[in-house]
Every structure is written in structure tokens, then in C-alpha cells.
Amino acid sequence: MTSSVIAQSVFPYRQLLVGFSGGLDSTVLLHRLMLWREQEPDVQIRAIHVHHGLSSNADHWVAHCESLCKSWHIPLIVERVKLRDEGLGTEAQARKARYLAFEKTLQAGEALVTAQHLDDQCETFLLALKRGSGPAGLSAMPVRTEFAGSQLIRPLLGETRTSLEKWAQDYNLCWIDDESNQDDRYDRNFLRLRVLPLLSERWPHFADATARSAALCAEQESLLDELLTEELASVISTEGRLRIEPLEAMSPVRRAALIRRWLAAHHAQMPSRTMLNRIWEEVALAREDATPRLHLGGFEVRRYKGELWWVKYQPTMIDQIIEWRDPSVTLMLPQGSVCFADGGHIRLPNPDEQVTIRFKACGILHIVGRHGGRKLKKIWQEYNIPPWLRDTTPLLFYGETLIAAAGVFVTKEGWIEKGVQLEWKA
């Protein structure tokens, strides 16, 4: 790959952030970009290395990347991340953390460049096939995709690992080998170490053929997107929720295609056919008085008021009581924060009143703007607060008296003509 070819592959970007693990693939990519920059000095390249903390060698890898980038005069950002168990598996969780770090580091006018190659594409296709994916999943990885308001570019997607090895040998490049790449308990490693060598030995152009199939699937998916764009817009509310009633009159195939695209708009991992059926049967068609939910990664598909909602999963806070010792400063909560701000109708606490944030209230409540008393459940219903927000919305208490619900109501015991408001940042 000549400098002109790599320049064309990232055109029109001349400011690049390169995902740099220190392995063979990203080392070759960074080297080629460095050679291009030597010919065109206005090109700006930064590298980012993500330290996952999964290997005892991780600190050595950082030192290697720092040394190489220093010798090539390329600024290196090292991001240390901690993986949270969200039920995705180690591989998927590491990838998620990595791309969150990329997104955080990417600057305006800069494109993200990563080093996936043809063999990676083949593995991705086979993993999607193993999951029973449709055209969207079998499209595997595009050369370019939208990312964090810019683009993610994969210039090496048409090259084999063998060609990258030859480049590295020709230029005497040094790289690191992650020992976990030899662990065939991981699906991708199993394919790379055991399956693909056999397939390539039997059919030398298997990876190329797989890439063509992935491209054809991507074309079909793109065509479907074009054909369904207007219809999808007609069944999505202005707030991004999916209306159930018009979907009921559609064929299962058409309905599933629209649900998939609604989920894709929320950057959800594409569900299996079984999961799509469950979204429709268990969530959309659940009885009216039910509060159905289906967990997808760190999010949930919920139904409320005849619509499907895509919401971030939040554990219940119902039994928590959090003391607010100094209401003049922001109080950090397990999920967000609260503070007092000017311009509301909440009275400030008296010096002898203990201030707490809670998430449930018992008995009959009297709120401003409503005649008579009612229970909290009834108040939530009147204000159209979705069920999943009812036990996570902060309730302000002075002593044992409910004063206000953040952003929703003030009780008669807490109201004053010129007071403050309770701001909640979730």
C-alpha cells in the first residue's frame, strides 16, 4: 500500500486518531500513516492505546507503544479502563470499553482509524453466521462508518494478515503478541487458530469470497434501508419511541425489519430472530396493566402508553435513603446528582430539619395543583411518569415529610412563593 493509496483511503481527513494496540496490524497501519506524513507534513496523526488491565503484560505493552510512538514522533494517548460486568463476555466488554475511550479522545475534525484486515472480516462474518444473523449482521465490517460525529475508517480491510506480516518484515518492524490471542476458548481465536487455516488450505480464496458475500449483504441491507426510511419515520414518535398500533397491521417480516431499524437507531446490538419475536410477543403485546421489559445489554425495551421505549437499565433505588448533610452543595447519587437551584417553589430546610433523598413515599400526599390527597402511585400515573422512573426519581424529604419530587411536583408542605427548585441530573 503506497502513501497515495492510504491517503485516498482516509480522504478527505488529514487529522487522524489511530487505535494502536502495539500488535502487528496496528503497527503496520501506524507505520504506513507515518510514511505518508513524511511526504505530506500537514497530516496530523495521534495514536491511542487502551490499557484494559486484563494481562500481567499490559504495562509492558504501554512502554512498547510509548517507545515506538516517540521514535516516530507520534503523540500517544494511553487510556486505562476498567471493565464492568454487563453480561456481554470479556471480549465484547473490552471492545465496548475500547470504543468508549476512542469516542472520548476523538477531536473535532479528526477521523478514527483502526487496523482490522481481511482475515478479521472473515472471522466477523463467520461469528455472525454462527449467531444466525441476517443481512445486517452478515454485512460484517464496512470500510467506513459513522462514529462519534465523525467517521471510523478501516484502510486495511482488503488486505490479509500475511501481507501485513510481509510489510512488517520488509521494514524490520517490532510488535507485541497478546498471549490471550492463543486462547481458543474465545470464539474469535478459535476461528483464527483452528477453523480458518483449514478453510484457507482447502479454498485459498475463502476470505476473499467471504468478504464479497459480506459486501452483497451490505448492499441488500442498504436497499432495505432506503425502501423503509419513510415508513420507519411514520411509526416513530418525535421522542424516538416506536408506536405499536401501526405495527400490528403489518406482516411479521415487515414489522421485524422496522423494529430492527428502530433498535439500530439507538445503537443497539442487533437481536436474534428469537429476541425480536420476544420483543413483540412479550413486550409489545403484553396486557395493558403489565409492565413488560426485555433486557438487551445495558438497556431495556419497555412498553408504556402504546409505545416501545429504549431505556438504559437502572437498578431499583426503592429502599435507599441518602442523607444530604449540606444542601448548599451538590449531592452525588448512585445514579446522577441533585442540587438546589434558583427559580422554584421549594422552601429551604429549617436548621433543625434533616434532609434526605428517598425513592418511595407512603400514605396520602397533598401536592400543589391537585385537589385532595392521593397516593404516590396515583400521582405518578397522573403525571405520566413511566414505571421504570418511579423508583429512581429522587424524592426530597425534610425529616419524615415529603417536600418534592425532582422535576415533577412540590407538596403543599414544601411549597413557598419564592423558593428553589430541585435539579436532578441522571
From Swiss-Prot:
InterPro entries: Lysidine-tRNA-synth_C, Rossmann-like_a/b/a_fold, TilS/TtcA_N, tRNA_Ile_lys_synt, tRNA_Ile_lys_synt_N, tRNA_Ile_lys_synt_subst-bd. It comes from the Bacteria. GO terms for molecular function: ATP binding; tRNA(Ile)-lysidine synthase activity. SMART domains: TilS_C (SM00977). Signal peptide: none annotated. Keywords: ATP-binding, Cytoplasm, Ligase, Nucleotide-binding, tRNA processing. Its EC number is 6.3.4.19. It is an enzyme of class 6 (ligase). Ligates lysine onto the cytidine present at position 34 of the AUA codon-specific tRNA(Ile) that contains the anticodon CAU, in an ATP-dependent manner. Cytidine is converted to lysidine, thus changing the amino acid specificity of the tRNA from methionine to isoleucine. This is tRNA(Ile)-lysidine synthase.
